Amino acid sequence: MTVTIYDVAREARVSMATVSRVVNGNQNVKPETRDKVNEVIKKLNYRPNAVARGLASKRTTTVGVIIPDISNVYYSQLARGLEDIATMYKYHSIISNSDNDPSKEKEIFNNLLSKQVDGIIFLGGTISEEIKDLINKSSVPVVVSGTNGKDEGISSVNIDFESAAKEITEHLIEKGAKSFAFVGGDYSKKAQEDVLVGLKDVLVQHELELDEQLIFNGNETYKDGLRAFESLATAKPDAILSISDEQAIGLVHAAQDAGVNVPNDLQIVSFNNTRLVEMVRPQLSSVIQPLYDIGAVGMRLLTKYMNEEDIDEPNVILPHRIEYRGTTK
């Protein structure tokens, strides 16, 4: 039988309001009364209902987390960072997988609101117009981590993908690359746009250009990397920038199967630097994103909104660096 707040109050011989104050950490309770109530809570193994507490205090100490693909290593590392900070600030997370489906995201978003969450955090993915509208009308604060929400007026944490793309392109040109291709994905459209801007800007400076036929869009998976190479192979690019590690590994394997030497004939760079980059030979050159920090800082930003703290910068850009390994010269 479920133990209720009424049972605790009766056993401790106090009012239900007093039990509620103890459970919610209200300091306006005598120490001896607090100790007595806590003893009864422990004795009866009472577990407060978060939603019921939320109705009284207008807070449930829960946050909703929406992830495009929880099985993706990139998003799991973001999730670890946010979960640690949520725990530090005594929040519980409700994690939901959206499959990058706007209709499913909308359903999850509304479901989280119905659960009285105190805030919502999106991990990566693309912010659709429908979701942007929901965020702007939301009764609770929302932060996105792993994508840039500045243009949409949404608080966010990310790296500067445009700057990273410029650095990579300059390096590859220095190493002899003249023909470039780009492999993107549906999960990271904003990052993809920024990478293409940086790539094209540097190519123009060197009197080169990116053939639109050498832009491949997929779902950021290993199989998409295989398909991308098949699509791009006849053009024989010198270098490929890939938005995800899984895609890039597919590119490496497809190139090797076709007898193309990586990196002598084809240089490949990815943008995630998950643990997968060291599991392929040659090891994958990649942009090192502070994935754990992106998730952690996103959650900390959300806690500031939920606790009505001062916000110095609603759109945080964290530093990145590039690790050139075996897939580049």
Curated annotation (Swiss-Prot):
DNA-binding region location: 5-24
This protein's record includes keyword Lipid metabolism: no
Superkingdom, taxonomy of origin: Bacteria
Gene Ontology MF terms in the entry: DNA-binding transcription factor activity; transcription cis-regulatory region binding
Keywords: Activator, DNA-binding, Repressor, Transcription, Transcription regulation
Domain HTH lacI-type intervals: 1-57
Stored Pfam families: LacI, Peripla_BP_3
Keyword Lipid metabolism assigned: no
Role description: Global transcriptional regulator of carbon catabolite repression (CCR) and carbon catabolite activation (CCA), which ensures optimal energy usage under diverse conditions.
Official protein name in the record: Catabolite control protein A
Lineage, uppermost ranks: Bacteria, Bacillati, Bacillota, Bacilli, Bacillales
